[in-house]
């Protein structure tokens, strides 16, 4: 099966998304991941030099093809976190609209916020494909961790 996985976080970020995708490859599937630039878990929650200025936007690792959308680095503070989420959403949506490959199914691998998987919906609707959502929704806890007060929710 030819699978498109959409998740804001992928290797080298410290999330298990890469483990799942690599296991799917070991089981005989073709996997492409639409993801963002690494920044969560990186030094100062910033984008590493090897991903700046348009570098490494398409990669192949352990059989998985990786397509990277631009995004604002996570850094610290609630405003930066919101910019990070919105920039991935916007840029990955643009990328999803232009993917030429035909995938059999889309897997939305979503931590939070839920809009992370919208690029998968964009692709699935355009190409009339099924989409599976694997959701680890942490809202509103992720907002309080990002600096929003409990009273503001």
What are these regions (language model features)?
Residues 18-21, 46-49, 82, 120-124, ...:
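Short, glycine/charged-enriched secondary-structure capping and boundary segments
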Residues 35-98:
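A conserved catalytic-core segment of Leloir-type glycosyltransferases
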Residues 1-54, 58-59:
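N-terminal subdomain of nucleotide-sugar transferases
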Residues 4, 32-34, 67, 107, ...:
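Hydrophobic/aromatic beta-strand patches that form the interior of the parallel beta-sheet core
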Residues 8, 73-80, 127-153:
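Acceptor-binding helix/loop patch of EC 2.4 sugar-transfer enzymes
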Residues 25, 60, 121, 125:
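Anion (oxyanion) recognition and catalysis
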Residues 14, 85-93, 105-129, 133-142:
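An aromatic- and histidine-rich active-site surface loop
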